Structure formats: C-alpha cells, structure tokens
Amino acid sequence: MNKTVVVAMSGGVDSSVVAYLLKKYTSYRVLGIFMKNWEEEDSNGLCSTAKDYEDVERVAEQLDIPYYTVSFAREYRERVFSRFLKEYSQGYTPNPDVLCNREIKFDLLQKKVVELGGDFLATGHYCRLDVKSQRVGLLRGKDPHKDQSYFLCGTHPESLKNVLFPLGDMTKREVRSIAAQAGLATAQKRDSTGICFIGKRPFKSFLEQFVPNVEGEIIDYDSQKIVGNHEGAHYYTIGQRRGLDIGGSEKPCYVVGKDMEKNIVYIVRGEDHPLLYQQELTAKELNWFVSPESITRCSAKVRYRSPDEECEILHTGTQDTVRVRFTSPVKAITPGQTIAFYDGERCLGGGIIEVAMTPHSV
C-alpha cells in the first residue's frame, strides 16, 4: 500500500508546487491540509485567511487531491501570540515565525497528520534535511535568497523525522516556472510577507491594541539630553532608525538601548557609532541538531536577513545557555531575536538572544 503524505497548503505558490510535484512524480497518496492559526475577526479581516483557503481549494481541485482544514487558533494564541506580547512588553523583539514552527507546524500539525493516516508531512520550506544518520540534520536551501533554515533552527530534530521539504534543492524562480507550466491557480500569487496576525496594518497600530501606550523620553546617550518623546519603549527595537522623528542632526539616529523600568529609549547618532556594535552575546532556549560539545567555532545569523558572522561558542557549563563571541563586532544584536548557528550549509542549531554585551552599559 502506498504511503500517504499530507501537504501543509497555505494558499501560496510554494506549497501548491509541493502538492503538484508529489502528486505528479511520486507514488505517494497526497492529501492537502490548510492550517488556520488566527481568527479573522481578530484582525479585522486583514489576515486574508478566507482568500488563502479559496486558493487551497482551487489548487487541490486542480490536482484532484482531498483537502482538509484545521484550526489551531486557540493553541496559537496560547503558545505563540501570548508569548509574543509578553516579550514585547518586556522590551524584547521576538520572532513568532520560529516559535510557530516549533509549537504549531511541527508539533500540533504533525499530530494531525497522524490522525489523518499520514506517514509524512510536506511543507514548502526552502531548506533540506539530512536523514542519513540517526539524528536528523538541517541544511540550508539551495536558493540563498530564500533559504529558511533560520526559521527552523529552533525545531527539535525529532519533530522533523517524518518531514519532506521538496523545494529544498530548488530556487524560487524554478518554483514559479513549474507553477506556471502546470497552470496552477496560485502561479502568479505574490509571496506573503510579515507576520500573519498583523496583516497590512502598521505594527504600532496593531500592538497598541494589546500593550498600553505609556509616554516616555528619548535620550541621546552621548549627551544625556532629552531629544524627543515616545508612546512606549516596547515599540522600539535595537538598531531601529525609522519612526524616531528626531531632527537637528546631519547624522541618522539609531536606537541603541531601552530602560524598560524607566520607559526610556536611548539613541545614538551615526551608523558607525561604537555602541551599535557588539562582539559577544548570551543565548538561551537552545536547540541542537548536532552534539553541542563538538562545536567551538562556527558562523551565526543574528536575524533572518543578516550575513553569516564568524564566531566562537563558549559553553557555560549548563545546557540552558551559551556565550557567543564574534570575530568582528556585529551591528544591532537584538535581545529576543533568534540566533542560528551554521557550519557551511549545515545548521547546527539555534537559540534566543538573551543579552548582547557592549563595551559600555546602555
């Protein structure tokens, strides 16, 4: 009897092509499943869930595959969104996509796949798996512009044992071409960007619905003078330049620190200001695809679009945290963001940035 693969279909071109490739070129029995993580009424209809589901229906019917829908809205709110709000209110800048992969897609959705009689879960992620050894390995996707291993660095290896990433060896251009040649209904659909529960709204207007505004001061760190006011330090992230509304300087202003107790935002002037650069950080909530004791030197990404930075991992004697020392100073390391570790194309693991060390305290 042929094995069954359940495709996580988002209504986008990537997951549509995954379903198409598995249906056309494999002997698997292919099912589609649409995962709803956010109640549309909570986002004033801006999360496009209904339109996305319509696109899933159209593609599934084109391919003649059964399709299902499942709602994890309550679990998403409890396990992802509530933490997102808590961390923002504490001054961190969390990445909900990394948490969603760990808590929802490769946990709850995996369990749903089993309920449906599935042997595998397939998604449209641009990354690859190494299943040759007992421990599943995570590799970068072939397309460096679309590689999504960063977003999976926090997902436990055991959760990826029965997962397929058919797009891992493909570029986005190739995927678009396949979708067009196959006449898929989503072939011309634009890629989704940003956080789904925010939709098209400005981030601040969304967040202020859940975290109250508290007016405070913006202070120039060097002069210690008040240079502006804000409606809440939680709205600002380290390295932020836009939205400060501070004049009187030829050099651009950047957020360099926040005092959450006093509700103060500190800025510096000039993109080369030394306080914008850090050479060491502490990471927590670690997840490894290899034995951590075997890692001394590697490279790391401190945010999705950042370049790889050469670093040394200093083990602290506990399994909960590590110190990371970079070969060269790195700009705007942001507590709350995910750090992913690499050795070439192999993702070694990841964690959450707890604190970045600067030569001076901010």
From Swiss-Prot:
Query: An example Gene Ontology cellular component term from the record?
Result: cytoplasm
The main place the protein resides is cytoplasm
The residues the entry assigns to the signal sequence are none
**Where does the entry annotate site (Interaction with tRNA)?**
125, 337
From the UniProt record, list the reaction(s) this protein catalyses.
Answer: S-sulfanyl-L-cysteinyl-[protein] + uridine(34) in tRNA + AH2 + ATP = 2-thiouridine(34) in tRNA + L-cysteinyl-[protein] + A + AMP + diphosphate + H(+)
This entry's Enzyme Commission designation comes to: 2.8.1.13
Instruction: Note whether Oxidoreductase occurs among the keywords.
Output: no
- Which residues participate in ATP binding? 8-15, 35, 124
Per the UniProt entry, the disulfide pairs are 100-196
Top enzyme class, one word, equals transferase
Q: Gene3D superfamilies, alphabetically? A: Adenine nucleotide alpha hydrolases-like domains, HUPs, Translation factors
Q: Enumerate the UniProt keywords alphabetically.
A: ATP-binding, Cytoplasm, Disulfide bond, Nucleotide-binding, RNA-binding, Transferase, tRNA processing, tRNA-binding
Active site (record annotation): 100, 196
Q: Which HAMAP family match?
A: tRNA_thiouridyl_MnmA
What is the protein name for this chain?
tRNA-specific 2-thiouridylase MnmA
Gene of this entry: mnmA
